[in-house]
């Protein structure tokens, strides 16, 4: 198989110079009241400071958030304006659900490949603690009509049509817009479709927490997770607060299913918690990085995105996106040294892992003769996954990329796959490598 790499027209690779993230915090804990735009400003500002980057060399910033704040629809531009960067720095926002920072990274990489920019920042941030609370459709329409009313009588007439239920706040939807099916219900679908047992789900969650705890204890994450002093500045957080330091496998069996209480197997412990956090990546043209004296963490070798139907098992995106990225890289699964898969739910991760090794799935769904390949668990999520770290939707992709490259470097180099499912039946995969 021919080895292929993502390069500019002059043959220069796309370098990932550095990556950084905030600690990931459970909803309504350390970052309670801190909006995503501020989390984005915090992490980008620290990335620049930590790596002594002159803000003037940043040509482009692409950032994203999934839970949109109406008052700051272009989070990327707000980050530029709020961090002392050059106000002429190009900035725009993207959203690809849970694969958002994969998308922002690819957008910057493509700009470098095209020769439009030399240096860019990509990333994402989300806050489940500062969510946009809406109003009912009837109240929203009435409020618009009130602005057009010309008399007190007209206003009173409009208000009289509202009932008490019309005045109640509307929380952000947790279900797919097109189907009304929640992520948890989809995880239950997948557990049933692919025969993922409750015991296996519990075991994966326990493994994730155990490995994340070990990684923190060994200091592996200290260099890629910053300390944050958040408002009201009475305390600080310097590590994730989602993982369970004393995870005991037997304790998982005591929990009841939450999405299908009668026949289900997915519990709160085998689902990622609602999380706040931000993450950013500094990318450069390979030659520019050398000119500036930076030693890159690694390089983007290839990437792939995929989309599938949303009505059934829509979190199978990694199984569709991964073969695209592998083919573009000229690689097989066995060639990889590390595999990092977003664990939205234990059932989702296990279903994808199972289908990676299924010839039937490859032939019927992917149009391939052979399976993607069986996953070697010694390579899989070796530092734990999203079940332990948490999942600020737009930040997870950047976490996966940075964490994988740092671990590859600790192991002496190599090639790693990062992949994630996303709402809307989307999937993302990116292959990264070190020198």
UniProtKB/Swiss-Prot annotation:
**GO MF term set:** acetyl-CoA C-acyltransferase activity
Task: Kindly identify the residues recorded as the active site.
Answer: 98, 391, 421
Q: Give the GO terms filed under biological process for this record.
A: fatty acid beta-oxidation
Listed pathway(s): Lipid metabolism; fatty acid beta-oxidation
What GO cellular-component annotations does this UniProt entry give? Answer: cytosol
EC number annotated for this UniProt entry: 2.3.1.16
Reactions mediated catalytically: an acyl-CoA + acetyl-CoA = a 3-oxoacyl-CoA + CoA
Q: Where is the signal peptide?
A: none
Keywords tagged on the record: Acyltransferase, Cytoplasm, Fatty acid metabolism, Lipid degradation, Lipid metabolism, Transferase
Does the keyword field hold Coiled coil? Answer: no
- Locate the transmembrane regions by residue number: none
Q: Which Pfam families match?
A: Thiolase_C (PF02803), Thiolase_N (PF00108)
What the entry lists under InterPro entries is as follows: Ac-CoA_C-AcTrfase_FadI, Thiolase, Thiolase-like, Thiolase_AS, Thiolase_C, Thiolase_CS, Thiolase_N
* Subcellular localization(s) per the UniProt record: Cytoplasm
The superkingdom of the source organism is Bacteria
* Subunit structure of this chain's protein: Heterotetramer of two alpha chains (FadJ) and two beta chains (FadI).
Q: Quote the function comment for this protein.
A: Catalyzes the final step of fatty acid oxidation in which acetyl-CoA is released and the CoA ester of a fatty acid two carbons shorter is formed.
Protein family (similarity comment): Belongs to the thiolase-like superfamily. Thiolase family.
Q: Tell me which NCBIfam families the record gives.
A: AcCoA-C-Actrans, FadI, PRK08963.1
What protein am I looking at? 3-ketoacyl-CoA thiolase
The organism's lineage is:
Bacteria, Pseudomonadati, Pseudomonadota, Gammaproteobacteria, Alteromonadales
Q: Which gene encodes it?
A: fadI
């Amino acid at each position: 198989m021919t080895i292929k790499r993502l390069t500019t027209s002059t043959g220069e690779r796309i370098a990932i110079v550095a990556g950084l993230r905030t600690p990931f915090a459970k909803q309504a804990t350390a970052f309670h009241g801190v909006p995503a735009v501020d989390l984005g400003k915090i992490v980008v500002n620290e990335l620049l400071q930590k790596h002594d980057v002159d803000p003037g060399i940043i040509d482009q910033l692409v950032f994203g958030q999934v839970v949109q704040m109406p008052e700051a629809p272009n989070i990327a531009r707000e980050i530029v304006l709020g961090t002392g960067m050059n106000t002429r720095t190009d900035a725009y926002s993207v959203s690809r659900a849970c694969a958002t920072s994969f998308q922002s990274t690819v957008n910057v990489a493509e700009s470098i490949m095209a020769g439009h920019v030399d240096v860019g920042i990509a990333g994402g941030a989300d806050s489940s603690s500062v969510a946009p609370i809406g109003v009912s459709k009837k109240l929203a329409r009435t409020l618009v009509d009130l602005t057009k009313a010309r008399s007190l009588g007209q206003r009173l007439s409009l208000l009289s049509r509202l009932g008490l239920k019309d005045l109640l706040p509307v929380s952000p939807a947790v279900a797919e817009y097109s189907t009304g099916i929640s992520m948890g219900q989809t995880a239950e679908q997948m557990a049933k479709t692919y025969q993922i047992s409750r015991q296996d789900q519990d075991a994966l969650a326990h493994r994730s927490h155990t490995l994340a705890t070990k990684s923190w204890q060994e200091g592996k994450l200290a260099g890629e997770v910053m300390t944050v002093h958040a408002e009201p500045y009475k305390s600080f957080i310097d590590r994730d607060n989602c993982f369970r330091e004393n995870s005991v496998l037997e304790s998982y069996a005591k929990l009841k299913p939450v999405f299908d209480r009668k026949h289900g197997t997915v519990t709160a412990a085998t689902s990622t918690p609602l999380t706040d956090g931000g993450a950013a990546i500094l990318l450069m043209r390979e030659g520019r990085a050398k000119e500036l004296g930076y030693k890159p963490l690694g390089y983007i070798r290839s990437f792939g995105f995929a989309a599938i139907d949303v009505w059934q098992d829509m979190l199978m995106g990694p199984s569709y996106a991964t073969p695209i990225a592998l083919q573009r890289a000229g690689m097989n699964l066995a060639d990889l040294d590390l595999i990092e898969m977003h664990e939205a739910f234990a059932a989702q991760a296990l279903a994808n892992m199972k289908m990676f090794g299924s010839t039937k799935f490859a032939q019927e769904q992917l149009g391939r003769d052979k399976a993607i390949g069986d996953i070697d668990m010694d390579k899989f999520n070796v530092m734990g996954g999203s079940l332990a770290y948490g999942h600020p939707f737009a930040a997870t992709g950047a976490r996966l990329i940075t964490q994988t490259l740092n671990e590859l470097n600790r192991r002496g180099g190599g090639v790693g796959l990062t992949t994630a499912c996303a709402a809307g039946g989307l999937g993302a995969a990116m292959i990264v490598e070190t020198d």
